[in-house]
Amino acid sequence: MTNLTLRNQLTPKQIVEKLDQYIIGQNGAKKSVAVALRNRYRRQLMDESIRDEIIPKNILMIGPTGVGKTEIARRIAKIVRAPFSKVEATKFTEVGYVGRDVESMVRDLVEVSVRLVKEEKMQLVRVKAEKNAEKRLIKLLAPSQKKKQTTSQNPLEALFGGMNQPDESPEEEVDQELKNKRSQIEWRLQNGELDDEIVTVEVKEQQNPMLDMMRGAGMDQMNGMQDALSGMFPAKKKKRKVTVREAKKILFEDEASKLIDADELAAEGIHRAEQMGMIFIDEIDKIASKEGGGNAQVSREGVQRDILPIVEGSQISTKYGTVNTEYILFIAAGAFHMSKPSDLIPELQGRFPIRIELDKLTQEDFYKILTEPDNALIKQYKALLKTEGIDLIFTKEAVERIAEIAFQVNQDSDNIGARRLHTILEKLLEDLLFEAPEINMESIKVTENYVNEKLAPIMQNKDLTQFIL
């Protein structure tokens, strides 16, 4: 990375400004994450002798649910297009117990990283891949007479997916009539006239969904064996009838994959995961050990000890190659209602030197969440009803009342942070969303009286409040 590329990267202040577009408050957390991110760019500029000595300062976020812990990490990864993986600590168990192996978090990160790199490389070969895909599609829509004659297939070839549709060889003669037909199809294809026509294409068979279900039951170790076996035989394919519009996408992806070097893709994916990857470990407080926990405490402490070497830096085998986790940034988060950070084993505590306590949301925060972010909830509901031709208008007093109710319900019952706004707005607009297709009005105004009318009966009944809001 050169000085020029570093100057082109976002500064910590710019990162915080971008986060402000989506997340209200929590400036301390935003600052810490922005600095951690900038330090990764700075590290790339250093001499190799000192670069290897500088490891990311992992972050521990402490705060109740719904205050923005996950959203900060998720948004930061999107802003910088860094590989990002979110896991829940409660999904893991120590090796030998039923559950997911902790190493799977690294494998998930590498999958995301390789996918990001592949998307970028596909854009680089897009023009050529689209041209090749179009040629194949034209041949499918106007096959030669020789192609139409079906040949008996070897049983073993059929078993292992040898169903490829061979294109005409360069030496094969194509008569003038077929050339004219294909030329006409090409013109119509480029003008979108054939987008809704049906064509038969061959696609790779998807992995059996049962295998995905088994992964959750501690079967991550099967991945390597499955990948090794799949490499021994050609990918099994099946014929599918799709529209020309869908066929364009299928054939483009297939042609783009042929133009991308698989080894280079894997190497770059691993490098990016190692140098720029971020793993968000949620609910880490749930595996904090407490005295007198019995077998449950042993299991929780076991998970911590399994996570420790990954956070410290270790070599993890994936289907793309070995990954060094030493320079991956780990962000852990938890509410710590029933435990405290000091309940984590000392070695793990030491691996999260940056501690950030996120603030509880105030009534003013709720108001800002409803109105200020680019993806604010009120803007979302307005857009939903706009599709029905209705202009939804909220008065300032109505929004203030919604914020007040959300804050009050959080105070009186379980505090679920900003997520409370989802339940309140859904209840408030339930009838309107249901009746919208039959309403012959160009605009509807939501006033403070409307909010009180819809929510007051529920607010007055504590039992109903707990169940509905």
UniProtKB/Swiss-Prot annotation:
Keywords: ATP-binding, Chaperone, Cytoplasm, Nucleotide-binding. It is found in: Cytoplasm. The keyword Metal-binding does not apply. InterPro entries: AAA+_ATPase, ATP-dep_Clp_protease_ClpX, ATPase_AAA_core, Clp_ATPase_C, HslU, P-loop_NTPase. One of its GO terms (cellular component) is HslUV protease complex. ATP binds at I24, G66, V67, G68, K69, T70, E71, D282, E347, R419. Its main location: cytoplasm. GO terms for molecular function: ATP binding; ATP hydrolysis activity; peptidase activity; proteasome-activating activity. Transmembrane segments: none annotated. It comes from the Bacteria. It holds the Pfam family AAA_2. GO terms for biological process: protein unfolding; proteolysis involved in protein catabolic process. Coiled coil: none annotated. ATPase subunit of a proteasome-like degradation complex; this subunit has chaperone activity. The binding of ATP and its subsequent hydrolysis by HslU are essential for unfolding of protein substrates subsequently hydrolyzed by HslV. HslU recognizes the N-terminal part of its protein substrates and unfolds these before they are guided to HslV for hydrolysis. A double ring-shaped homohexamer of HslV is capped on each side by a ring-shaped HslU homohexamer. The assembly of the HslU/HslV complex is dependent on binding of ATP. Belongs to the ClpX chaperone family. HslU subfamily. This is ATP-dependent protease ATPase subunit HslU. It comes from Listeria monocytogenes serovar 1/2a (strain ATCC BAA-679 / EGD-e).
